[in-house]
Swiss-Prot record:
Signal peptide: none annotated. Its EC number is 4.1.2.63. The keyword Magnesium applies. This is 2-hydroxyacyl-CoA lyase 1. GO terms for biological process: fatty acid alpha-oxidation; protein targeting to peroxisome. Mg(2+) binds at residues 463, 490. It catalyses: a 2-hydroxy-3-methyl fatty acyl-CoA = a 2-methyl-branched fatty aldehyde + formyl-CoA; an (R)-2-hydroxy-long-chain-fatty acyl-CoA = a long-chain fatty aldehyde + formyl-CoA; 2-hydroxy-3-methylhexadecanoyl-CoA = 2-methylpentadecanal + formyl-CoA; 2-hydroxyoctadecanoyl-CoA = heptadecanal + formyl-CoA. Binds 1 Mg(2+) ion per subunit. Binds 1 thiamine pyrophosphate per subunit.
Amino acid sequence: MDGVEIIAKSIKNSAIEKVFGIVGVPITPIAYELQAQGVGFFGFRNEQSCSYAASIVGYLTGLPGLCMTVSGPGVVHALAGVLNAQSNGWPMILLSSSIDQSLVGKGGFQECKQFESAELYCKKCYYLTEIDHFPEILKDAIETSLSNRPGPVYIQIPADLIKSKCKESPNIREAAGYGTIAIKSVVPDMKLIKDAVQLLSEAKRPLVIGGKGAAYCRSENELLEFIEATKIPFLPSPMGKGLLRDDHPLVVGAARSYALKNADVVLVLGARLNWMFNFGKAPTFSTDVKFIIVDVDENQASKTKNPNVVPEIAIVGDARLSIAEMRKLFIGETDEQPQPPQDSLIKSMKMEESWWSNLNQDIQVKTKSLATLMSEPQNNDQEYLTYHKVFNALRVGGLFQEDTIFVNEGANTMDIGRLCIPQTLPRSRLDAGTLATMGVGVGYSVAAQICFPDRSVVCIQGDSAFGFSAMEMEVAVRYKLPIVFIVLNNNGVYEGLESMSDPKYTSSTESASLHIPPTSLSVDTKYELIMQSFGGTGYSISTISNLLDICKQIKSKQISLPTLLNIKIKPTGTKPKIVH
């Protein structure tokens, strides 16, 4: 067997069904052999977007996505997705070629310190020295990527090994199953679980925050049972939305600011008290708030290592297992007594009635305020659309189904979209995440549609965010992915210009560089033509009536997908009225 066949067979035997990558010397034969082995290969136009796609696969499926690149620049480009996977805690495998072993340090083709670069962001890096070791390295890489706090790993294969030969060995034939590797969940300390339940039961204004870590470990069923048993208010992080339906009566997303500021005990479940939560500090939180942190990351669930807060109780453990045990303690359920007793801890909870009444009052005010913004009419066809008007039309037009995967990226586009589009299922709202990475949207959408071919995928981006990966429209068309891409086009980053007719913008390159605002992009760019040029469908939209008509055609399958809707919105003065 040659190296190409060994690599492809090992990947196939380990049950990896799809690989994302960009071919080149010397990995092109591997891509062909993967296809011959029945493994789907999805070729992208840039390793950055390709690696973003591989990074989100781990979150969506619970199993690492595999990104394959050439050496040197290919690896460097793909490190964007590796860093994204590391910061979000998602499993991922980056597999790349490198210079022949005999040529290291001699200035060979695309030689660079790629291994050292990958070490900065990966849980573990592997440098292959014998091709017949690849199957066992792949097995270890998968296990490492999935275990404890998930994250990316890197496998580097010198070009001479890819071209080498060896006899087929048992470890090649018997590569451990990708989908069958048993990864043990991190079991929480039951004493700490009991302490957490006691503290929550004594709280007057308790709150549960659920993050994408809780979503990753599939804790939604256990979390729902816990929240409904205790009646403790639940607040999702941006990508924790859908753990409980946004319209569940115990979800307080609309009263986010009030809930955070007034809670006295907060159970943080698979979320980090980072910049999204003002690092757990005032004025976002009360100065005397007590935190219970549950996380598989020992640095987060620690009284000494957490960089932002000293939690009252720190539990290193799987969110699903932890919340299930907490519910049992609250209701008094045991293996010997599966039916809850009459004197369960639920009845002795000290949660104030005013806590819920005040939250509900704030929810009503904020919900009404948001509804007012969204329901503002477009008075005439010449009036600019706004973010809220567009999101309202998309909802009214029925573009979002119960199981739609909503990819949302941009600045204003993402912030307002989080509020305007309700979520009903976990892991179904994908955004810029912990790292606030711009450029992830198209790669995420492609990966989501590949992973879930029977679900609709809607990607809504600002025009700036779309620009990072616009060429990947060709990938969506090539693989016949029925994604709806929507670009909210305000001619800029945050805001743009309504016109560039002023001579100071057009008279010369020097004048343009001195006068065009740094936030401005070209005016009225026809992004829909990008999709059309590849054979997809695209539309320029500037009115609500036109948008509703297009939504109707998409729903009735009168429009072939993928499609891109280039929606023109007000370029200036659109500082969003974020409602929390």
